[in-house]
Amino acid sequence: LRIDRTLKAETDPAKALQAVGAVTLGLDLTLRDLQDDLKKKGQPWERAKAFDGSCILADWVELSEIKDWKDVHYTLHVNDELRQKGDTALLIFDIATLLADISQVFTLEEGDVVMTGTPAGVAALKADDQLTMTLHGQSQDFVWKTFVQA
């Protein structure tokens, strides 16, 4: 979710949702070996989460393409094999409620990105893996292809 206007302490989920300007799919990558090593040492994990290329974002899709926030499906294929399948109907908290709750804790500013979670299917990627992310919109599908760089 791309935030297009400041959102602070909003208690009305419908109003919170109005701060969203566009949606996309993203991959929030983790260097698991480094993360495990940092955990064993009792150190923070940010080096395993914040590295060059650690957050792949597809192109933004305008909200006019999303008619029903409760019926958005998305998939990730790795080398043409289905790896992850998600659906906004399966989120613990709907998107509007999630945004309102976040805005109670800290201010969301224009340009901020909110990622809503990861469906089952997390697994290691290898150099040159071909990734296909698909956002199944109500009027059309949006497909992005990329690959894992060494």
Where does each model-flagged region fall?
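Catalytic-core "active-site belt" of small-molecule-metabolizing enzymes
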Residues: 1-105, 109, 113, 122-150
